[in-house]
Amino acid sequence: MIIIPARLKSSRFENKVLECIFGLPMVVRCAKNASLVDECVVACDDESIMEVCQKFHIKAVMTSKHHNSGTERCLEAAQLLGLKNDERVLNLQGDEPFLEKEVIAMLLEATKNAPFMATCAKVIDKEKAKNPNLVKVVLDHQNNALYFSRSLIPFLRDFDLKRPTPLLGHIGIYGFHNREILEELCSLKPCVLEEIEKLEQLRALYYQKNILVKIVQSESVGIDTKEDLQNALKIFNSLPTTP
């Protein structure tokens, strides 16, 4: 099951999930793309999102406006849907309308072997890494996340720039091995690191829970600001009306 948490009042770009992208609202494009891989549902926090989903025949459930994270919203949706405890759950951010279905499928498969949870990242250049809206991640020798940050990590002190630069940009999708793990993560007390960085995945690392990171090739652009949207529209200027 793929759950898309969709919040209307985004702090950096209000109503962004309803922004039109080549004929489709952003959240609808996310859902149509995800539904090519697995069953998909949108976890709404506002009637306007629900109405848009219904208009485009997208399955949706209404959740509380008071969740602190998309993960909490996904858990409520999973509970409302009555998902089995052993069912794998993907949390696809509602601002990833350009994420390739192949990447979603790869994460769904990788989640089978992840003891706790999994996510995706792609190689980025130093200029892109300077953007605090693009979250960076560093890994251990088994491709488990060591840390996520809005800062440039690792810091390239005296690094030979002729070598491949080990900079990885995080992609806004998470896979949970089963519903019970989703419940476990939400039961953990928020930590200071996630509050400082405003990155919910840091809670798992703080409590020593592994996040397996699948390195993928992707042209996807997460939409955090109006500028992101305008830049993305220039890049993806030939998308069809439906994914």
From Swiss-Prot:
Keywords: Cytoplasm, Lipopolysaccharide biosynthesis, Nucleotidyltransferase, Transferase. GO terms for cellular component: cytosol. It catalyses: 3-deoxy-alpha-D-manno-oct-2-ulosonate + CTP = CMP-3-deoxy-beta-D-manno-octulosonate + diphosphate. InterPro entries: Cytidylyl_trans, KdsB, Nucleotide-diphossugar_trans. The keyword Mitochondrion does not apply. Pathway: Nucleotide-sugar biosynthesis; CMP-3-deoxy-D-manno-octulosonate biosynthesis; CMP-3-deoxy-D-manno-octulosonate from 3-deoxy-D-manno-octulosonate and CTP: step 1/1; Bacterial outer membrane biogenesis; lipopolysaccharide biosynthesis. One of its GO terms (molecular function) is 3-deoxy-manno-octulosonate cytidylyltransferase activity. GO terms for biological process: CMP-keto-3-deoxy-D-manno-octulosonic acid biosynthetic process; lipopolysaccharide biosynthetic process. Its EC number is 2.7.7.38. It is found in: Cytoplasm. It is an enzyme of class 2 (transferase). Activates KDO (a required 8-carbon sugar) for incorporation into bacterial lipopolysaccharide in Gram-negative bacteria. NCBIfam families: kdsB, PRK05450.1-5. Belongs to the KdsB family. This is 3-deoxy-manno-octulosonate cytidylyltransferase. It comes from Helicobacter acinonychis (strain Sheeba). The gene is kdsB.
